[in-house]
């Protein structure tokens, strides 16, 4: 069943917003859905334990019955880079450990599964490992979320180069307009479409309420080989 790794050009550029929109689009097409965000920092304490807002959003778009801990097995309170949060908590944040956790979700064989990373492609894990090493272990095609703002062309092209250089397929990309006041917005989008070696799955404008349904209205899953 189709599964994809979702990464972004930076942190705070709407990876979860786009991932939730993709999951909603798949559910609306009658597909079963599952998701994982294997590591998250900036989690809030609750009666059930630490909970991450982004992971909860993804969980809400899963049609399969998943426990929170399956979606987000490693949750840390400090709103800092995951490897630093893990170090403070005395947790070994290895690609192999994350891979084992994600495999549990992939084994459910949902019609459409997304695995969302944290930050960008080279976010550090344990030692010299990065989140890109997890993506390599999973061997999933990648969806790149481009946060459209000043500097996004360079960030997007470098990210795509790194993804392909790691031997993974770039299945598609999404233009998420995080700064609608970006100078020469249309020209920037045209350059991204010309230079990125993958189909664009959609252009998502800055929305007052970026609900999964509202985001899904701007996305197209067909380039991922999913008929709607």
Swiss-Prot record:
Protein residues bound to ATP: 12-17, 54, 116-119, 205-207
Gene Ontology CC, one term: cytosol
Record text on subunit structure and interactions: Homodimer.
Top-level taxon of origin: Bacteria
Binding site for substrate: 41
Family: Belongs to the dethiobiotin synthetase family.
SUPFAM superfamilies with a match to the protein in the record: P-loop containing nucleoside triphosphate hydrolases
Name of this chain's protein: ATP-dependent dethiobiotin synthetase BioD
This protein's record includes keyword tRNA-binding: no
Record: residues binding Mg(2+): 16, 54, 116
Pathway membership, UniProt: Cofactor biosynthesis; biotin biosynthesis; biotin from 7,8-diaminononanoate: step 1/2
Nucleotide-binding recorded as keyword: yes
Localization, UniProt: Cytoplasm
SS bonds (residue pairs): none
Needed cofactors: Mg(2+)
Molecular function via GO: ATP binding; dethiobiotin synthase activity; magnesium ion binding
Catalyses which reaction(s): (7R,8S)-7,8-diammoniononanoate + CO2 + ATP = (4R,5S)-dethiobiotin + ADP + phosphate + 3 H(+)
Alphabetical UniProt keywords: ATP-binding, Biotin biosynthesis, Cytoplasm, Ligase, Magnesium, Metal-binding, Nucleotide-binding
Protein task: Catalyzes a mechanistically unusual reaction, the ATP-dependent insertion of CO2 between the N7 and N8 nitrogen atoms of 7,8-diaminopelargonic acid (DAPA, also called 7,8-diammoniononanoate) to form a ureido ring.
NCBIfam families the UniProt entry points to: bioD
The EC number(s) this enzyme carries: 6.3.3.3
Major localization listed first in the record, in broad terms: cytoplasm
BP terms from Gene Ontology: biotin biosynthetic process
